[in-house]
Amino acid sequence: MNNLSFSELCCLFCCPPCPGKIASKLAFLPPDPTYTLICDESGSRWTLHLSERADWQYSSREKDAIECFMTRTSRGNRIACMFVRCSPNAKYTLLFSHGNAVDLGQMSSFYIGLGSRINCNIFSYDYSGYGSSSGKPSEKNLYADIDAAWIALRTRYGIRPEHVIIYGQSIGTVPSVDLAARYESAAVILHSPLTSGMRVAFPDTKKTYCFDAFPNIDKISKITSPVLIIHGTEDEVIDFSHGLALFERCQRPVEPLWVEGAGHNDVELYGQYLERLKQFVTQELVNL
């Protein structure tokens, strides 16, 4: 999430715009697409073609474990979806909402590595305006996008909510919190979450204004599933205090992971990241 200039901050304060404009300023940095989806003659099967920028780290055999398709949202956009079969005996599937400056092509290698290490399959999607998804990124589209992904995961693959872990990273915590506040699932994982858009731009903000965007802080108490929060203590984009504030509002918090010294984009490089996820998925969820 990019910083606003002084003039832009003054404009926000003096002439508060609608939440959608705040969202666009703060959040969306879609990269040039790192992949394409090619449909076969039947119109039912899509093939994933990665560019060099996707930095694919695995063999063609692992790539065959990835299934891609397009689905339509309630707002009329077609979004790209990806199902990664990482483990044949996986009990859980992560519904993964990624960060603001990547697409599915860039995340595909990470998904295979993560899923195979914590014994979970991974379902992900690109936001409207990202990758092969149509439309433009916006707060309203974020919510419609994850709704479409949730429906596709349940109907196309028959995965029940009690076997879905809703996982959001950075801006991806926004649709994740919104969905989890409306539907119960096995668990929720929030990785470098934000409390709200205004609180990122104005750290001293104490309440949610009508023109605020991404109000996770006002929704998180509605989540009835167990919530694991992960945040780096030296996060330079979304301050560590956001993770703490959300943790304090959770109905069913589990032991959080505060990664000492980690920033916004390197939490997963620390050994305790995988250790905490493994413990949560393979041990704690069984007893919750």
Swiss-Prot record:
KW Phosphoprotein (keyword) present: no
InterPro entries: AB_hydrolase_fold (IPR029058), Hydrolase_4 (IPR022742)
EC numbers, comma separated: 3.1.2.22
Location of the active site: 170 (charge relay system), 235 (charge relay system), 264 (charge relay system)
Known role: Hydrolyzes fatty acids from S-acylated cysteine residues in proteins.
Catalytic reactions on record: S-hexadecanoyl-L-cysteinyl-[protein] + H2O = L-cysteinyl-[protein] + hexadecanoate + H(+)
Gene transcribed to yield this protein: abhd17b
Family: Belongs to the AB hydrolase superfamily. ABHD17 family.
UniProt membrane topology term: Lipid-anchor
Subcellular location as annotated: Cell membrane; Recycling endosome membrane; Cell projection, Dendritic spine; Postsynaptic density membrane
GO molecular function: palmitoyl-(protein) hydrolase activity
GO cellular component: dendritic spine; postsynaptic density membrane; recycling endosome membrane
Keywords, in A-Z order: Cell membrane, Cell projection, Endosome, Hydrolase, Lipoprotein, Membrane, Palmitate, Postsynaptic cell membrane, Synapse
Organism: Xenopus tropicalis
Protein's recorded name: Alpha/beta hydrolase domain-containing protein 17B
Enzyme category, top tier: hydrolase
Primary location group: membrane
PTM notes: Palmitoylated on cysteine residues located in a cysteine cluster at the N-terminus which promotes membrane localization.
